[in-house]
Amino acid sequence: MMKLYSLVIIATLAAAAFAATSEEISAAVSEIISQHQQDLERYAKIVERGEEPKKYIRCSKQLGEKCDLNCECCGAAAYCEDIVYICKEKISDNSILNAFGQAMTAMGNAVSRYYCDAE
């Protein structure tokens, strides 16, 4: 049983190595980092202008709905896409990169939760 388990793990890692190049992985990581950096910049500009920041409610938007910050989108791997500002989850058409990107987004969302208030 242990040999079968090890074989499955090795096969999965080999498939991941062939499916995703390091450039694709670093591009996905850079995209996720820039999304959270944009949240910070938008929030900082509001505070800098002395305006009362809009009250953002954590997990108040579903996938496909309009959003302003990542923390508004429901789902551990959901983020606010920065072109049309809608909640989405898909990072890449490559399933391995998509899974990796969703994991990175989930970690980033855990860090950036303080931008939104709990309801």
UniProtKB/Swiss-Prot annotation:
Keywords: Disulfide bond, Ion channel impairing toxin, Knottin, Secreted, Signal, Toxin. The keyword Cell division does not apply. Residues 1-19 form the signal peptide. GO terms for cellular component: extracellular region. Transmembrane segments: none annotated. GO terms for molecular function: ion channel regulator activity; toxin activity. It comes from the Eukaryota. Expressed by the venom gland. Disulfide bonds join 59-74, 67-80, 71-116, 73-87. It is found in: Secreted. Its main location: secreted. The presence of a 'disulfide through disulfide knot' structurally defines this protein as a knottin. Belongs to the neurotoxin 25 family. ICK-8 subfamily. Ion channel inhibitor. This is Toxin ICK-9. It comes from Trittame loki (Brush-footed trapdoor spider).
